[in-house]
Amino acid sequence: MEFIILSLLLLSLALYSLYYVIIKPKPTTQNLPPGRKGWPFIGETLEYHALSKKGCIEKFMSQRMQKYSSKIFKTSYLGADMVFLCSAEGNKLLFSNEHKLFKPWLPRIIENSFKSSPNITLQDEFNSLRRVIGSFTEPNALRRYVGMMDANAKRHLRKYWDGNDVVKVHDLSRKFIFALCSELMYNIHDTRTADELENLAHCIMTEFFIIPVNIPGTKFGRAVRAGREFHQRFRNMIKQRRLEIEEKREPEHKDILSLLLLEKNKDGEDLTESEIALKMQAVLIGAYDNPSIAISTIIKFLAELPEIYEQVLREQMEIANSKGPDELLSFDDLKRMKYTWNVISEVLRMEPPNSGTFREALTEVTIDGYTIPKGFKLHWAVNATHKDPECFPNPEKFDPSRYQGNDIVPFSYVPFGAGPHICPGKEFARLKLLVFFHNLVRKFRWEKIIPDEKMIRNPNLMPEKGLPVRLYPNN
């Protein structure tokens, strides 16, 4: 089956290439950014993902920046003409001109799977999700979540870490974050249900963002099927929640599902069950994927840098010693975790979970003297500025002190985006990470089983072997 699919794809590529050679594109007088498109349709997508799987995605950018002596270059990626922006100035232009010069973009087949309705634009979809997430993460709600997060972290460590000599970190970080988000966002307390949903989400995230060809038997096809099952599970939850509302049994706090049931479409009408289910899927995957990756990466760095671990432990012990034996963390406690957050920030600089997102030019735009035609796609590359010595001196050195002052070049540190459209879940993610590491470092020390294990992107960031570690309880 795979051979037949591959043969058909190669035949299509050959015919397209012949067409491309015979009917050459008309030359343009525009001063486009330097670069090449690579193979027709595929472009340089395969090379990008090959470097990702080797754990050196930044080479894709650095090689081209060096070759063209430019921090902006064009290529063809995910089937589209695309410009990579690799500078703080490029980031600033992109983040400061949403709706004016740029709009969100995803490959069509992925966009159609992401949008809750064919009649809604991607921009409207994002705006709707930002409203819901903004309500869910308003300051009073965040204060309420801290104790719940702390109780979840303690329960997770007792169940999956205590009594084990060796654990596989990445599996457990995914399990913890997904269960936590499921409970806070959708009032899911059943472990089995959360685990089943997490398996579906993992399939979607690991197999969706590849060459988007929806053919049975391919990885993308499996991701589409997982998405359909995910969708149906959420529709069942919506029916159950509506029944709870009728019977006045709904949760006390407004979770994501409650907020989505109040959301209206652009015509002022209630959202359909299918629209709500797709929004539920998008919010949950967004809240789960990057924080779970971040936990794995932070644990990796703390294993490699024992002196950093000791300082994190010292700060967390000071906070723990100021509280009663069974007293849960408060929002004010998290404000005191300044060094721990600096460490997490430096991990997110060196290994950002998200490699960047995409925009489309709404009009012709000039950047660094180059013309970006209307309709061209743009990619802001997180790794490019995070590893730029002009933005971060000695960029390969792990240095949490970078974040003690206000010396960071604006728009260079972008693991959550920047500007008016910074990730609305940033503070929610910060709380999850701080609460988890407050509990973890006080219970355990650890060492890597595979000393030279790399972080790779396949397509998302992950430890190549799942990051097995040996645990040493702190007595």
UniProtKB/Swiss-Prot annotation:
Identify the SUPFAM superfamilies for this entry.
Answer: Cytochrome P450
Q: Spell out the reaction equation it catalyses.
A: (21S)-21-acetoxyl-apo-melianone + reduced [NADPH--hemoprotein reductase] + O2 = luvungin A + oxidized [NADPH--hemoprotein reductase] + H2O + H(+)
Q: Which Pfam families match?
A: p450 (PF00067)
Keyword Oxidoreductase listed? The answer is yes
The superkingdom of the source organism is Eukaryota
Q: Which family is it part of?
A: Belongs to the cytochrome P450 family.
> What is the name attached to this protein's record?
Luvungin A synthase CYP716AC1
Q: State the organism named in the record.
A: Citrus sinensis
